[in-house]
């Protein structure tokens, strides 16, 4: 109770009776039995604790939730449960998520629009289907190529992954390369159409980047 009700207390929302009822509703919303109200945190499983964290985040009825690696520490089966819960809550409450993850399978499942970052900078953003089918930036291509296929006979070609597509912006091929010593080339986001943007030399043509 204390964990989930803390945002309500901090923001002076309702009296004690209202908070108890609100916490009960939030527990039910995330699939936990309201009888768990007075249990201690150590008695919950990892998946249950994550549900409690989601309930706490929903206490103030936000429109936007920042989910920073919300399933990375969970078993795969529990990950699926939490992701399905987040999708259900999105539909029911009309939520928008900013979802941070290193797991491309999770991103593919949960995201509508994907933004790829490297070295603290946005390098490519596009609708999910576009990004997975038509990646343009070499770093995005390397990320997707690094996902292992469930086939023991197909080994990852690590050499090809490193050829000009490392996480070092100075090693990227032109027109994507970011060189700290180059004061003349201006790097920015180029509009490729249909909400697809890629970071490159601003003098490069969109048609040339896509081809």
Question: Predicted segment positions?
Answer:
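Conserved ABC ATPase "signature" region
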Residues: 18-35, 144
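A short, surface-exposed alpha-helical micro-motif characterized by mixed small hydrophobic
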Residues: 107-109
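Hydrophobic anchor residue at the start of the ABC signature
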Residues: 54, 82
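Conserved ABC ATPase signature
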Residues: 40-44, 48
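Charged, flexible cofactor/metal-binding loops and thiol motifs
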Residues: 34, 128-210
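A short, proline-enriched helix->beta-strand linker immediately N-terminal to the Walker B motif
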Residues: 59-63
């Amino acid at each position: 109770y204390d964990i989930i009700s803390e945002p309500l207390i901090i923001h002076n929302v309702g009296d004690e009776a209202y908070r108890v009822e609100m916490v009960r509703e939030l527990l039910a919303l995330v699939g936990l039995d309201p009888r768990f109200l007075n249990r201690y945190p150590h008695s919950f499983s990892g998946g249950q604790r994550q549900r409690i964290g989601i309930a706490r985040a929903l206490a103030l009825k936000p429109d936007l939730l920042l989910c920073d690696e919300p399933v990375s520490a969970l078993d795969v089966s529990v990950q699926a449960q939490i992701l399905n819960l987040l999708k259900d809550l999105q539909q029911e409450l009309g939520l928008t998520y900013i979802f941070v993850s290193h797991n491309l399978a999770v991103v593919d499942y949960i995201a509508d629009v994907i933004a790829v970052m490297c070295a603290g900078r946005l390098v490519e953003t596009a609708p999910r289907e576009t990004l997975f089918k038509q990646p343009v930036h070499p770093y995005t291509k390397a990320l997707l190529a690094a996902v292992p296929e469930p086939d023991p006979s197909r080994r990852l070609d690590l050499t090809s992954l490193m050829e000009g597509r490392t996480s070092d912006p100075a090693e990227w091929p032109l027109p994507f390369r970011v060189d700290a010593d180059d004061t003349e080339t201006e790097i920015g986001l180029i509009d490729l159409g249909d909400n697809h943007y890629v970071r490159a030399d601003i003098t490069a043509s969109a048609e040339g980047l896509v081809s």
